[in-house]
Swiss-Prot record:
Protein name (database record): Uroporphyrinogen decarboxylase
Positions bound to coproporphyrinogen III: 44, 46, 48, 93, 170, 225, 364
Cellular component, GO, one term: cytosol
Pfam families: URO-D
Entry keywords, A to Z: Cytoplasm, Decarboxylase, Heme biosynthesis, Lyase, Porphyrin biosynthesis
Role of this protein: Catalyzes the decarboxylation of four acetate groups of uroporphyrinogen-III to yield coproporphyrinogen-III.
Species: Drosophila virilis
Site (Transition state stabilizer): 93
Length: 386
């Protein structure tokens, strides 16, 4: 066989240079394979509840940490030093994409992210700079590659992005919103411009996720955190088509990267199907508040569906069927319970979900005051429940 694309060849060599994975339970669960134990990781497992993170933040502002691979890796590693987690997730933020598109994003203490010059009208879309956006996000790829080596194969590394609707909401509202009323108004007032906006974001997201996979991400999560503001009809209009396009376009691109034949020598896997696994990462969709559309989510082609805490996992399994992995879905507020009560809740959650095709997690990111002991209890309970 002959090499048709040197870039593809170099990509595969780069991916194979990473240390071999020692704990692959997360990836096995996502693929529906037998696991040694129920894998567990926690959304926002790296962050403000850890004193070592707070110390680092005294020296560096939030986005400096995100943009500096050494600092991003340090924060990513912090929870792994404390807890027996089955995954790491690169420290970053979904709003790096609006930044790369030319918008200013500031992190205000006690408020959260603020975009001082939001997109108010369709005319403002001209301010966005999608050309070259990926080149302004390479620091994330650098952090992912660095982190894969620092992990030394301990656990898989997850990359992530915000979904188009969620990013559009922040960019229109100028930050977080309890209603997303301005963004929702676009769906009715500017339907064609909304489509153009969402397509623009989708295309940048696909570029961004492809870069993360090539950098070394072994799983990807797409955060549709603002789905809770959409009715089912609105979700199927303003979210679902773009989530589908992300998956389809990404898989198509990554598949094409390894279609050119490569030499079957000892430095490469022994067949094309194994080669594909190097590039086609497993995909998680987490659409918070979109329990009304689980069936539709199950038809998008994602490997894992994340559940928020309002969804009964038994009912979710009945809806999505046996061939999709579920992730979640402990109420983050339960992390403030007494240890014995938390242990009972976590154990009950795992019993409901079972050991097959399940990843234990919370139903949304944990909050800044989460007790460290609660993380210890959750991880231990998830591992020992079955």
């Amino acid at each position: 066989m002959t090499i048709k694309n040197n870039n593809n060849n170099n990509t595969l060599k780069h991916l194979q240079a990473f240390p071999p994975l020692k704990n692959d339970n997360l990836l096995r669960a996502a693929r529906g394979e037998v696991v040694d134990r129920v894998p567990v990781w926690v959304m926002r497992q790296a962050g403000r509840y850890l004193p070592e993170f707070q110390e680092l933040r005294k020296q560096h502002d939030f986005f400096t940490v995100c943009r500096t691979p050494e600092l991003a890796c340090e924060v990513t590693m912090q929870p792994l030093r404390r807890f027996d987690l089955d995954a790491s997730i690169i420290f970053s933020d979904i709003l790096v994409i609006p930044q790369a598109l030319g918008l200013t994003v500031e992190m205000h203490a006690g408020v959260g992210p603020v975009l001082p010059q939001p997109i108010c009208t369709p005319e403002d879309l001209k301010r966005l700079t999608p050309d070259g956006a990926l080149s302004r996000l390479t620091y994330v790829g650098d952090a992912i590659t660095m982190m894969r080596h620092k992990l030394d194969g301990r656990v898989p590394l997850i990359g992530f992005t915000g979904a188009p609707w969620t990013l559009m909401g922040y960019m229109i509202e100028g930050g977080g919103s309890k209603t997303m009323s301005k963004a929702k108004a676009w769906l009715t007032n500017y339907p064609e411009d909304t489509k153009l906006f969402l397509i623009l974001l989708t295309d940048v997201i696909v570029d961004y996720l492809e870069m993360q996979v090539i950098a070394g991400a072994q799983m990807l999560q797409v955060f549709e955190s603002s789905a809770e503001h959409l009715s089912k009809e609105e979700f199927l209009l303003g979210s679902e088509p773009y989530l589908r396009r992300i998956r389809d376009d990404l898989v198509d691109r990554l598949t094409k990267k390894v279609i050119p034949a490569v030499p079957l020598v000892s430095s490469y896997p022994n067949n094309i199907f194994t080669l594909l696994t190097y590039l086609i990462s497993l995909l998680i969709i987490f659409a918070k508040g979109a329990g009304h559309s689980l069936k539709e989510q199950s038809e998008l082609g994602y490997d894992v569906i994340g559940l928020d805490w309002t969804v009964d996992p038994v009912e979710a399994r009945a809806v999505v069927g046996p061939n999709i992995t579920l992730q979640g879905n402990l109420d983050p507020q339960s992390m403030y319970c007494e240890p014995n009560e938390l242990r009972s809740l976590a154990t009950e959650m795992v019993h409901k979900c079972g050991k097959s095709r399940y990843i234990a997690n919370v139903g949304h990111g944990i909050t800044p005051q989460t007790p460290i002991t609660s993380m210890e209890v959750l991880v231990e309970a998830a591992h020992n429940a079955l």
